[in-house]
């Protein structure tokens, strides 16, 4: 058997319409909330029986914006500055022979949504809005937790930035999204090789275009404006 067709069982609804700004790993911004919405064929509550007994879930999904026909045996992890090459299987790079991702998220709730059926509300996901999910498995602590594990070139989440907002800007961010946005920015969404303090970066988040600068270890949000015809991931209502 040389191949196998994976079926999309669900898609995520998140606050990230583009790749820029998505946390580099799941769980590092616990304030981020997303919805897992099942495809019509899999909207069967029996498939979720017992899932409420687990606190965390493992998602297997596709790097849908990074699918390529070819692949390279080595990649350049941003964590190492973008110059050092490592074997693709020694990294979590999206540029893989099979563009599959694995994320552990916290299960916040199981809800009924009109027109969507039963959905899963989760925290800490590192997925772009609309990302296809191929499988969901419960996280089992006794088997999946390894306190003695070593993290190679990424032993921790890295240095965090201090986030400041220009006068009046934070109030433009919906109150329920402020902590999540601050967490995203504190983890420095910039490409690792860009350190120009005069550069203005723009991040699309929760229906807003958020512009910021970084000087040293301080990130300053200079504006947060609503985007035209944009959508917020958890309800898809125009803002």
Residue ranges and their predicted role:
Residues 1-100, 112-121, 125-239:
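Mixed-charge, low-complexity intrinsically disordered regions
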Residues 13, 105-108:
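Conserved positions in beta-strands of structured domains
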């Amino acid at each position: 058997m040389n191949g196998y067709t994976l079926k999309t069982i669900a898609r995520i609804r998140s606050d990230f319409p583009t790749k820029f700004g998505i946390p580099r790993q799941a769980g590092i911004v616990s304030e981020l909330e997303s919805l897992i919405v099942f495809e019509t064929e899999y909207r069967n509550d029996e498939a979720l029986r017992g899932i409420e007994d687990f606190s965390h879930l493992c998602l297997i999904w596709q790097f849908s914006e990074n699918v390529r026909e070819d692949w390279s045996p080595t990649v350049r992890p941003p964590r190492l500055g973008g110059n050092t090459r490592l074997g693709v299987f020694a990294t979590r790079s999206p540029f893989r022979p099979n563009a599959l991702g694995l994320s552990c998220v916290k299960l916040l709730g199981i809800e009924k949504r009109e027109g969507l059926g039963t959905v899963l509300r989760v925290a800490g996901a590192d997925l772009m809005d609309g990302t296809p999910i191929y499988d969901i498995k419960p996280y089992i602590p006794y088997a999946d937790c390894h306190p003695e594990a070593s993290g190679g070139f990424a032993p921790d989440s890295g240095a965090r930035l201090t986030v400041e907002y220009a006068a009046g800007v934070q109030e433009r961010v919906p109150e329920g999204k402020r902590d999540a946005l601050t967490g995203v920015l504190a983890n420095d969404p910039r490409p690792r090789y860009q350190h120009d303090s005069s550069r203005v970066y723009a991040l699309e988040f929760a229906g807003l275009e958020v512009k910021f600068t970084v000087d040293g270890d301080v990130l300053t949000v200079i504006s947060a404006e609503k985007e035209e015809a944009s959508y917020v991931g958890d309800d898809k209502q125009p803002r």
